[in-house]
C-alpha cells in the first residue's frame, strides 16, 4: 500500500454588477445646474470544495481516483456564501458665475449581510467651494493662477463583514484527534469521544440580529493654489473623521463556551493634515523634470468602546488605563498583544517592558 496523499481544491467567485444612471444639466445666464439619479445592484457568490485522501494501493492514477484511498482518512468539505447590495443615489450640482460651487449627494444602501430591521443605511453628503482666483480683487494681485477653497462634510457606511453574521451558525470543521478526523458542534457537545478525551468545538457564530451599518462622518477643508503659469502647485488638506457603531468581534468570557461575536460598538477618530507640492522644474522641448513633495501627519484615537463593553474592560493597575485585548483572550499568553484602549491609538501594542537580559543562572532564579 502506498503512502501517497492526494488533494483537490476548487474555488469559484462570481460577481454581477448592474448600474443605471440618468443625468441632467442646464445653463442659463450665470447659473449652471446638474443632477444625477442612479441605481446599483450587486450580487456576489463564493463556492469552494476540498477533497483529500491517502493510503492508495499505488500512485499510478494520481488524483483521478480519490475514492481508492482509505475511507477512514478521506476528507470532503465545501463552502458556500452569497450576498446582495442594492443602492439608490442622487446628486445635485449648482455653480454660479463659475466661482461658487455647491454639491449635495444622498444615497441609500441595502445589504443582505445585516438583520431584517437594519439592512438599509442612509448616507448624505455635501460640499461647497470658492474659486477665489476668479474674483477681480484676486486677479489684481497677479500672484495666483489658481486659488480655490473647499469644504465638505459627509456620512458613509461600511458593510465589511462576511455574510450570515446575524445568524446562529454551527461549525462543521473536522479536527484530527486520536488517529481520526472528527466533527464537533456547539458548546457542551462532544463528538466521537467521551470524557476528558472529547472534542469541544466553539460554536461558529453567535447570532446578532441587531447588526447594522458602521458609519463614518467626515469633514474636510482644503486649499488649491497654482503659481508661475501653473508650474508650481500647492494643495493643503485638513480632515477630521469619526467612525461609530464599529463592526468588530467582541471578546467573550471563555467560560461561556464561545470566544467572540460580531457587534456594533465603540467609536474611533482619525484626524490630520496633508501638504502636497508639485513643481515643473525644467520644461524643454525634448525633456522635462518634475518634482513632488508630500508631507502628512495623521493621528487616530479610540474614543469609546461601547457602554456594554466598558463595564467589563480590563484595567492597568499602574496607570488606570482601561482596555480590551484584540483577538482571542487565550492568545495573549503566547503572542504579542494588541489592545483597544480609550484615549490611545487603535490596536496599540501592550506588554511588559524589558529590564535587561538574564546573563547567569542565579539571575534567573
Segments predicted by a language model, with ranges:
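Extracytoplasmic gating/loop element in the C-terminal half of outer-membrane beta-barrel translocons
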Residues: 68-70, 111, 348, 357-365
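Extracellular/periplasmic, surface-exposed regions of secreted and cell-surface proteins
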Residues: 3-332, 337-340
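A detector of mature, structured extracytoplasmic domains
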Residues: 324, 338, 347-361
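Extended ligand-binding clefts on enzyme/binding-domain cores
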Residues: 343
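Extracellular/surface-associated beta-sandwich interaction domains
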Residues: 265-267, 330-333, 352-354, 359-365
Amino acid at each position: 500500500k502506498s503512502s501517497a496523499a492526494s488533494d483537490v481544491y476548487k474555488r469559484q467567485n462570481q460577481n454581477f454588477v448592474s448600474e443605471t444612471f440618468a443625468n441632467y444639466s442646464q445653463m442659463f445666464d450665470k447659473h449652471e445646474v446638474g443632477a444625477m439619479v442612479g441605481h446599483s445592484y450587486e450580487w456576489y457568490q463564493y463556492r469552494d470544495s476540498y477533497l483529500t485522501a491517502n493510503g492508495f494501493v499505488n500512485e499510478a492514477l494520481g488524483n483521478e481516483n480519490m475514492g481508492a484511498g482509505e475511507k477512514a482518512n478521506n476528507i470532503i468539505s465545501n463552502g458556500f456564501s452569497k450576498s446582495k447590495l442594492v443602492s439608490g443615489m442622487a446628486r445635485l450640482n449648482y455653480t454660479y458665475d463659475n466661482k461658487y460651487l455647491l454639491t449635495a449627494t444622498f444615497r441609500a444602501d441595502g445589504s443582505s449581510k445585516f438583520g431584517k430591521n437594519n439592512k438599509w443605511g442612509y448616507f448624505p453628503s455635501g460640499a461647497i467651494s470658492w474659486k477665489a482666483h476668479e474674483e477681480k480683487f484676486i486677479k489684481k494681485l497677479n500672484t495666483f493662477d489658481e486659488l480655490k477653497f473647499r469644504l465638505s462634510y459627509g456620512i458613509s457606511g461600511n458593510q465589511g463583514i462576511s455574510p450570515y453574521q446575524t445568524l446562529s451558525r454551527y461549525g462543521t470543521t473536522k479536527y484530527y484527534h486520536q488517529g481520526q478526523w472528527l466533527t464537533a458542534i456547539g458548546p457542551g457537545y462532544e463528538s466521537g469521544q467521551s470524557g476528558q478525551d472529547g472534542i469541544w468545538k466553539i460554536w461558529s457564530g453567535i447570532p446578532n440580529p441587531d447588526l447594522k451599518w458602521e458609519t463614518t462622518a467626515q469633514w474636510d477643508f482644503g486649499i488649491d493654489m497654482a503659481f508661475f503659469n501653473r508650474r508650481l502647485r500647492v494643495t493643503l488638506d485638513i480632515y477630521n473623521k469619526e467612525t461609530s457603531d464599529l463592526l468588530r468581534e467582541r471578546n467573550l468570557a471563555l467560560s461561556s463556551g464561545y470566544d467572540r461575536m460580531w457587534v456594533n460598538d465603540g467609536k474611533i477618530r482619525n484626524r490630520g493634515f496633508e501638504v502636497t507640492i508639485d513643481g515643473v522644474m525644467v520644461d524643454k522641448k525634448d525633456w522635462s523634470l518634475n518634482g513632488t513633495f508630500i508631507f502628512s501627519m495623521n493621528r487616530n484615537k479610540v474614543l469609546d468602546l461601547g457602554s456594554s463593553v466598558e463595564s467589563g474592560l480590563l484595567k492597568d493597575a499602574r496607570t488606570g488605563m482601561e482596555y480590551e485585548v484584540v483577538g482571542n483572550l487565550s492568545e495573549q499568553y503566547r503572542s504579542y498583544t494588541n489592545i483597544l484602549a480609550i484615549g490611545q491609538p487603535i490596536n496599540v501594542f501592550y506588554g511588559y517592558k524589558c529590564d535587561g537580559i538574564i546573563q547567569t543562572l542565579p539571575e534567573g532564579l
